[in-house]
Amino acid sequence: MSAYVIASYDIADPDHYKDYPPAVGPIVGKHGAELLVADMDATPLEGNKRQVYVVLRFESEEAALAWYNDPEYAPVRKIRLDSTANGTAVIAKGFVPPSA
């Protein structure tokens, strides 16, 4: 079952953050993920708007966790964590409707 990493955050240090997008792409690709959303101009409906919204689709929750816990990603993740604020990131499982 597909799993989705959904993240939102504000960029607190643009000079430091600029290193994150080009560094994370190859690691995401290595784990077979598909970038579905990368939006810095999302339309808020409820709650507090964040500057960045990202949705990645992985083959499974295990694949998403393998990416997140990949030692190669650790220093790249640190760039994001050190240069952003108000962040959240979750893994959500895909919905499979019950058979009728």
Protein language model features and the residues they cover:
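Short S/T/G/P-rich N-terminal loop/turn motif that feeds into the first structured element of a domain
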Residues: 1-52, 58-69, 93-100
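Generic beta-strand structural signal
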Residues: 52-54, 87-88
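C-terminal structural segments of small proteins and small subunits
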Residues: 65, 72-91
